[in-house]
Amino acid sequence: MSDDARDTIANGVGEDAAEMPNSDSPAEDAAEVQCGPATTSNEPAPDDHMEEQPEITAMCAESTPPGILDQSKASAADETPLNGEVTEDTLVECVDSVSLEGDTGSEIPLKEQDDAAVDPSSQAGRWAGWGSWGKSLLSSASATVGHGLTAVKEKAGATLRIHSANSASPEGAPTDAENGISGNVTPDQDPARGPHTPPPPGAAGSRGMLSALTNVVQNTGKSVLTGGLDALEFIGKKTMIVLAESDPGFKRTKTLMERTVSLSQMLREAKEKEKQRLAQQLTVERTAHYGMLFDEYQGLSHLEALEILSNESESKVQSFLTSLDGEKLELLKNDLISIKDIFVAKESENEANPEEQGLEESGEEFARMLTELLFELHVAATPDKLNKAMKKAHDWVEEDQSVVSIDVAKGSEEEEKEEGKEEKAEEPEEDKTGGQGAKTVEEVYMLSIESLAEVTARCIEQLHKVAELILHGQEEEKPAQDQARVLIKLTTAMCNEVTSLSKKFTNSLTTVGSNKKAEVLNPMINSVFLEGSNSTTYVQDALQLLLPVLQVSHIRTSCLKATAQPDCS
């Protein structure tokens, strides 16, 4: 083909290229506009269309004449990207042969490619719409739950009469946090796409929607859990405070429980107080304090041990009763009640006939009676210490009374023989004889309190030994009702002996202190009577501590008779 023919063909191709933008297909317009050198723009292409650019460039290289392609290469080489990035797919060398005829088949892939580019964006828009709808729904649910919890807490505070304004600040914190979460995520401001940016592809839109939904669900769960726990804690605390303040019996019951103490605790406290008082006084003489003397003779220790034994026996009785039911339970209850009635009858008898107590008995008579009663209990206990204490108390009282009577007789004879001046000369002799045998009022008072404390301590010790032997060392089993009656006789004899001793002590005080003033003598006499009454009370309380011990003994005896109950131990 000649040169003229080539020029003619080139001109024809140029005219065809100029007429192509007038085509009706929008896909062809877009493709040709991108391929033309005049359409080169300095604006950066979106990231979503970076993958489409190499294909379009290749297609343009195939359908563009060499002259135009060279010009586009030169212009592209002169221009640099705005972002400073150089892409490898921007310039593609045309190595294939260029056809001068228009390729009609290239129009169809361009249309399909354009449709493929449009479909992901529309799909992403639909995903973003669903994401915003879900986030708005969860946000509204979170806000509703937060407001509900706040309303519950406010209602509880109003019901419990809580008017403190400071309590409102911690209550409003969870609600503000929930409102802040719901306010940051709104349907109008979608975090997956900006207001002016094009929609992302389908995969990016779905990932953004899922992450947003996950964050909202996590925040909602945290707010619901935290708010619920705070509400429950708030209601519980305020309820307990109101109950403690409004219940009239709550404080009274608590006070009574704190004041409830045992007899041994009271005696120990009295002992400690007396020690503190004596520590402040720099005295060497022995003082007549009943609590300290009672502890010196180990009465307090035996009383505490008896209390512990009684409490353990009581717990055993209760645990055994819970293991029974029906007829067996009723029979056992009747037996235990009958044992208790014996002790109750003894208390009422002591209150009704207090004048029968305090019958005077000699030390030998009391020792004989005590030995017989212990033998009836079938326990190997000998009252040696108690008998010695009783004998010691009776001996010094009798000795003091004899000395006082001799001194009184001598004084009366001398008064009859001599009068006037002779009386003045004989007064020193009377003082010498009296000082040798007779005791002073303070000494008699001291011996009285000491004897009462020693005798009472020995009585408590004897009852403690009897309780131990009833539980663990009986030679022969005896019905609990009979043992209860014997124990009542034993404690009655002890109380009568203590009362008799206190009366003897007061008589001795009155005789020795006949020359003393009433202001000095009467407090001593009253103190001896008071300590004697306290001693009998301690012995009676120790008897009541033996009731659970006898009940346990009866349960064991009944179990041995049945010989078929595994609960017996």
From Swiss-Prot:
InterPro entries: DUF719. Its main location: cytoplasm. One of its GO terms (cellular component) is cytosol. Keywords: Cytoplasm, Phosphoprotein. The modification Phosphoserine is found at S262. GO terms for biological process: angiotensin-activated signaling pathway; connective tissue replacement; fibroblast activation; fibroblast migration; fibroblast proliferation; gene expression; heart valve morphogenesis; inflammatory response. It holds the Pfam family DUF719. It is found in: Cytoplasm. The modification Phosphothreonine is found at T197. It comes from the Eukaryota. The keyword Acyltransferase does not apply. Residues 1-87, 102-126, 165-208, 404-439 are annotated as: Disordered. Over-expressed in brain. Also detected in lung, stomach, and in a lower extent in testis and thymus. Belongs to the FAM114 family. May play a role in neuronal cell development. PANTHER family: FI01459P (PTHR12842), PROTEIN NOXP20 (PTHR12842:SF4). This is Protein Noxp20.
